[in-house]
Regions:
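Assembly/oligomerization scaffold segments
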Residues: 1-102, 190-191, 197-205
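Acidic, small/polar-enriched beta strand-loop surface segments
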Residues: 2-15, 165-322, 334-347
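Short beta-strand and beta-hairpin "edge-sheet" elements
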Residues: 25, 66-93, 167, 299-329
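Oligomerization/assembly interface segments of phage tail-like spikes and tubes
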Residues: 36-53, 87-96, 222, 277-286, ...
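Amphipathic, non-transmembrane alpha-helical segments in extracytoplasmic/periplasmic proteins
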Residues: 44-45, 81, 92, 105-129, ...
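Short, surface-exposed ligand-recognition loops at beta-strand->loop->(often short) alpha-helix junctions
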Residues: 50-56, 110-111, 287-290
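Short coil/turn segments at secondary-structure boundaries
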Residues: 55, 104-108, 245
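Short beta-strand-centered interaction patches in the first periplasmic/extracellular domains
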Residues: 85-99, 132-211
Length: 347
């Protein structure tokens, strides 16, 4: 879509359900921040305010007003104003914001994860748009937890058992749960009507980043609780990684009624996923594309700047203007194991 036209993002204001109008020319610094570990997208901008200018009446933006960002009839953002400052600064969030605010009591008694997700949405009053098959059994009680925290934990349990990563997002007022894609998106930018679109990864801004062992874990212990007692079900470790980087251990608990084979597979998946160095890169001032959201994969080919291969977008900030620009935080999709694959699993 982005390759078909020159971006023209317009901001519309709604009050009490009624359209006030296009206020694009009255605002500056229109940006959207989208992060993988945040359920909602944040939109921020500043409104021109001059109490002495009769030709620039106060828009009187207030918490609860709705805003939409439209690009050539396509909705890019729809949300509610949460903060309106006296200085004209405004912050709005999409509907995912509500999932981080309301706390509920929820119990899953050995049900399939997809059923737990459906029941969770019904209890929280959030329509479920769609959910992939999640056969992992969930056995847990949450008291006074946000829906987003419960959902994240359920999907983490599923990932540990299946080895697949999952992502959830609020869109069109509904919650959607899907498998995390590994296919790169075709991200194009068209700077002018008389110029052809080009892949945004062809022209990079400033590139920075780091390689880190901060998130590395090379030994897992799986436990099972029974009343006041807990017992060890199994362990998984990489001796070579422990010898090189030191022991970093994490204790996990069974999420349901896993058998021995499932427990073994879960330990193997946990170790394979977490016994890795984290390679992150940050790119500032890259050409903008609406298809670039948190969680998507981009393909880079700039070995000179240490940015080559497939990278997942962990965070993106869109700066809507002339031109449309972005800043990206990326993580390597398939970072190598920390020190070989000589894993030892005991169940």
């Amino acid at each position: 879509m982005a390759r078909e036209y020159v971006d023209d993002h317009r901001l519309f204001l709604y009050h009490g359900g009624s359209l006030v109008g296009d206020i694009t020319d009255r605002v500056s610094g229109l940006t959207a921040r989208d992060e993988r570990n945040a359920l909602s997208v944040e939109l921020s901008f500043s409104v021109l305010k001059n109490r002495t200018d009769a030709l620039a009446p106060d828009l009187k933006l207030a918490p609860g007003d709705k805003v939409r960002v439209i690009n050539h009839a396509l909705e890019v953002f729809s949300g509610v104003i949460v903060t309106a400052g006296l200085d004209g600064s405004v912050t709005a969030y999409d509907q995912g914001w509500y999932l981080n605010k309301s706390q509920i009591i929820f119990q899953a008694s050995g049900v399939a994860a997809e059923d737990a997700v459906a029941r969770l949405c019904a209890k929280a009053g959030i329509p479920l748009g769609g959910c992939v098959s999640l056969p992992t059994r969930i056995q847990k009680i949450w008291t006074g937890s946000e829906l987003s925290a419960i959902l994240s934990e359920i999907l983490e349990i599923c990932t540990a058992e299946t080895g697949e990563e999952y992502v959830y997002r609020v869109a069109s007022g509904k919650l959607w749960v899907n498998r995390q894609t590994r296919e790169p998106v075709a991200a194009y930018h068209r700077p002018a009507d008389n110029l052809s679109p080009f892949p945004i990864t062809w022209a990079l801004g400033e590139v920075s980043g780091s390689d880190s062992m901060e998130e590395l874990c090379n030994r897992f212990v799986l436990t099972e609780s029974n009343g006041d007692e807990a017992k060890v079900i199994g362990t998984a470790e990489n001796p070579d990684s422990i010898a090189r980087y030191g022991l970093v251990q994490r204790v996990e608990s069974l999420g349901g009624d896993e058998n021995t084979a499932q427990a073994r597979q879960r330990l193997k998946n946990l170790l394979a996923k977490n016994d890795r160095l984290t390679r992150t890169r940050e790119v500032s001032q890259i050409w903008g594309c609406d298809e670039v959201r948190s969680g998507v994969v981009l393909s880079f080919g700039s070995g000179t700047y240490g940015l080559s291969g497939l990278y997942r977008v962990d965070a993106v900030t869109h700066s809507y203007g002339k031109p449309h620009l972005m800043s990206l935080t990326l993580s390597e999709l398939d970072s190598p194991r920390a020190a070989g694959t000589g894993d030892v699993v005991n169940v």
